[in-house]
Design a protein with these regions (language model features):
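Active-site neighborhood of HAD-like aspartate-dependent phosphohydrolases
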Residues: 1-47
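Conserved hydrophobic residues forming the short capping helix/wall of the S-adenosyl-L-methionine
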Residues: 72-77, 111
Length: 180
């Protein structure tokens, strides 16, 4: 099975240090929706794993999050693709849960959903160290994009084996070229 795990904010949509709090603030990055659709058309399964501590902070509610995810899924479907699974961590860092990246709880949930022992070799695409480290903990292959917080992330050391691309579309170009 060909599976990819994507972070949301900064990879699929614009990110903000003030959080993405509602459907109007959820704006896709150029080429990201089409990139997901291209993966699907090539037989890939797509999962999204996203920290959403704005829920715990009271910045937005679960309905707001559902509306944002509905918009994302609808745009991907309109482009001819699909998102097979979206998992989110609603906790603040102080909650000390195991689902908040950089811990691998959400990635284990994804592996379980797809009946996989781990995510060995699965591309995990993120814009921050926490995305990459969470993926490494379950054997995934880290891909960093320069969108979102990606340029800031490049200022520090990257996990071994991290591949760096301009954006999600460039990652997909690379993966699909390897499928040929």
């Amino acid at each position: 099975m060909k599976l990819i795990v994507l972070d949301r904010d900064g990879v699929i949509n614009q990110d903000s240090d003030a959080f993405i709090k509602n459907v109007d603030e959820w704006i896709p990055l150029p080429g990201s929706i089409e990139a997901i659709a291209r993966l699907c058309k090539a037989g890939w399964h797509v999962a999204v794993a996203t920290n959403q501590s704005g829920l715990a902070r009271g910045l937005f509610g679960i309905q707001d999050l559902s509306d944002m995810h509905f918009k994302m899924q609808q745009l991907v479907m309109d482009a001819g693709g699909r998102i097979d699974l979206i998992v989110h961590c609603p906790h603040a860092q102080a909650d000390r849960c195991d689902c908040r990246k950089p811990l691998p709880g959400m990635y284990r949930t994804i592996a379980s959903h797809f009946e996989l022992e781990d995510l060995r070799g699965v591309p995990v695409v993120g814009d921050s160290h926490r995305d990459l480290h969470a993926g490494l903990m379950v054997g995934a292959t880290p891909y960093l994009v320069r969108t979102g917080k990606g340029l800031r992330t490049l200022e520090g050391p990257l996990p071994p084996g991290t591949q760096v691309f301009d954006d999600l579309a460039a990652v997909v170009d690379h993966l699909l070229a390897g499928d040929a």
